[in-house]
Amino acid sequence: MRRRKAPVREVLPDPIYGNKVITKFINSLMYDGKKSTATTIMYGALEAIDKKGGEKKGIEIFNDAIENIKPLLEVKSRRVGGATYQVPVEVRPARQQALAIRWIISFARKRSERTMIEKLAAELLDAANSKGASFKKKEDTYKMAEANKAFAHYRW
């Protein structure tokens, strides 16, 4: 284990929107260090949302999607006297954002549209409208925390 907490590395805002969350999203989307490909996919998805999204801009829908998917509670396994309990815990803001990004990307990859740009645009629109697989994942996480509320006193 570390002697002290690892310093939080600062992320530069993206060049087009000046948004740090988009940079983190692009970095999570990237495979094999191919950042230019990930950037093309991200900006392509935001442009596709601009065309489909009606009066809202792509960046607004992106921000709504991230906010809608952020979980406030999750469960962690805790062993007490031979039994393992799923203990509900609050999620730190940085982890909320990381989980939201991770869930949106993973469920976008599982979608059936042809290109990743289309998949990501559709998943972001669904997430912004509180539907889709990533929103269901958040709801399931809440249900798990709610079902195990009795073990909340085992928090550490």
Curated annotation (Swiss-Prot):
Pfam families, sorted: Ribosomal_S7
InterPro entries per the UniProt record, alphabetical: Ribosomal_uS7, Ribosomal_uS7_bac/org-type, Ribosomal_uS7_CS, Ribosomal_uS7_dom, Ribosomal_uS7_dom_sf
Ribosomal protein recorded as keyword: yes
UniProt keyword annotations, A-Z: Ribonucleoprotein, Ribosomal protein, RNA-binding, rRNA-binding, tRNA-binding
Subunit organization: Part of the 30S ribosomal subunit. Contacts proteins S9 and S11.
PANTHER family tied to this protein: RIBOSOMAL PROTEIN S7
Protein name: Small ribosomal subunit protein uS7
Organism per entry: Campylobacter lari (strain RM2100 / D67 / ATCC BAA-1060)
